[in-house]
Amino acid sequence: MRVFLSAYGNFYLAIPITYISSIMLYSGNSDKKIEHNSENHNTYISLPILFDYTGETPRHGIILRNNMNDENNGIIKNKTILLTTEIEHEINIPEERIYSMPKILDKIKISRVFSGILFEPDRQDKNMFLFLNPEVLIQNLQKELE
């Protein structure tokens, strides 16, 4: 599975490339978890605020595909954009190394947005990778807004 990695404290957030339309530099200041732009109808989700890393500044915007066969991915209107810390790496991780999230974490609401976990004990800095499922993230946030 090819993913982009962004650092959050002591873990990497892994975002599968299959969900991504494109990436942009982000220099704005977001102080809300979710913001909707009424001009272009884009929805911005601040992952540092969502994950309670308010000291982290979003450096990139990850523009999600509207669906897997999205023909208009070059147009940045009516999109969901994940604001994230700097994307540090793009790597390929064999799917057989990724474990499903432990059931005990189901009690923690935020853990439901992750599709898997990987531990790399040989890494000195960040040895845990959490794999984001953007579809579940968006569904959960839409429920909050209703």
Q: What residues fall within each predicted segment?
A:
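An acidic, low-aromatic, low-complexity terminal/linker signal
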Residues: 1-146
